[in-house]
């Protein structure tokens, strides 16, 4: 047996704490079970419930991917089928009495729903930008609400609310019985599972829309560990950590992003020996995207990586990885190329303007510009560091001369770098929470006023790390006071 095709789009994910071998083996067994699972066979054994519609057939259709070259009419019909299905589930008199085969199926429905939404929005945007197919433009103009952002979000939030899954998860965190908070609908597996995976769906949709903080906020009630339900479905596991990691990256929390990406890559490397051939290509493609994102994050936030990941990075990117770390103008095209390769297919929250195609903005290009602005802000860091390795003290004007920039421009860059340099890491609680003492994102530290730069180690062993510090304006007075003192 093989997995449904839509599960083949994604690969497995891995939760943060992976030291427990027994639980690791449990997750591996779950993975093997999924490899042998055929969702459509289970669907065929589900009881049919009819109320002027065949709910069984609609559930089966909801978990089945469209053909890649599906026509617009087919996509419209698929949207109508989803609307009918979710309307029946959410608005029937009382909960629908339907036993789902397992939680894999519930993920399949939500995953395919969002995938079709994303694909339709991307296709509609492409049609608007090309502006060369009047027939399709007419169809899209006449159906502005089909696969609308509001409709999709409304379904996901409604499933979460109807199932009271947030209340159930909060109760579980407190050590209470979740069933006491589930209500009439939430105690049914159909609603509980759809509600749970709708939370993961919201993470994905908000990230696609570019609201990265809200994307992370949606997971407040879900704990990122191997005991969570999403960790038992490899596609959901992969999706969760990919979008959490990408959201962290776009919020400039690179340490947290590296942590999320690393756990996925390590997990996939440990399970690849029993991955089926049907999934291999998809997993390989997603792995390449992950490694590209790790390479980007490490360029911004140098850190020690797992040996498996570090070796794979060197094999995949080699000299490109070195160019990213060196920075400078020559690295800009490489950053852009890797971002295009690894980023999600961003979408716009509103339909494009078919009457004025010149005002339409490609969402991917929009987020690429935002990302490249951050790259340019950090572009000089490696170069500055290389100069400061040669000097104990350097005047700001002298450093600006080496960099061939105006002193005031360099001062502005240093101030921006100072503002973005310190960050705290996520350890527990909501993903947006920052706990612990702020840490240096890089080894560049600043004073309140920038007039000169100094290279000083924090300890005897730190000389090799190239730590450099921007000291305040009274550095000269300190130097004058230290004249004549012995060096050691």
Curated annotation (Swiss-Prot):
Question: Record's InterPro entries?
Answer: eIF3l, PCI_dom
Q: Which GO biological-process labels does this protein carry?
A: formation of cytoplasmic translation initiation complex; translational initiation
Q: Where are stretches of biased composition, namely Acidic residues? A: 17-27
Q: Specify one Pfam family.
A: Paf67
Which GO terms fall under molecular function for this chain's record? translation initiation factor activity
Q: What is its main location?
A: cytoplasm
Localization per Swiss-Prot or TrEMBL: Cytoplasm
Q: Where is the composition biased (Basic and acidic residues)?
A: 7-16, 431-440
Which GO cellular component term is one of those annotated? eukaryotic 48S preinitiation complex
Report the residue ranges that make up the PCI domain in this protein.
256-450
Q: Does the keyword Chaperone apply?
A: no
Residue span of region Disordered: 1-34, 427-449
Q: Which UniProt keywords apply?
A: Cytoplasm, Initiation factor, Protein biosynthesis
- How would you summarize the oligomeric state and partners of this protein? Component of the eukaryotic translation initiation factor 3 (eIF-3) complex.
> What function is annotated for this protein?
Component of the eukaryotic translation initiation factor 3 (eIF-3) complex, which is involved in protein synthesis of a specialized repertoire of mRNAs and, together with other initiation factors, stimulates binding of mRNA and methionyl-tRNAi to the 40S ribosome. The eIF-3 complex specifically targets and initiates translation of a subset of mRNAs involved in cell proliferation.
Membership in a protein family: Belongs to the eIF-3 subunit L family.
Would you tell me the protein name for this molecule?
Eukaryotic translation initiation factor 3 subunit L
| Annotated source species | Phaeosphaeria nodorum (strain SN15 / ATCC MYA-4574 / FGSC 10173) (Glume blotch fungus)
Give the organism's phylogenetic lineage. Answer: Eukaryota, Fungi, Dikarya, Ascomycota, Pezizomycotina
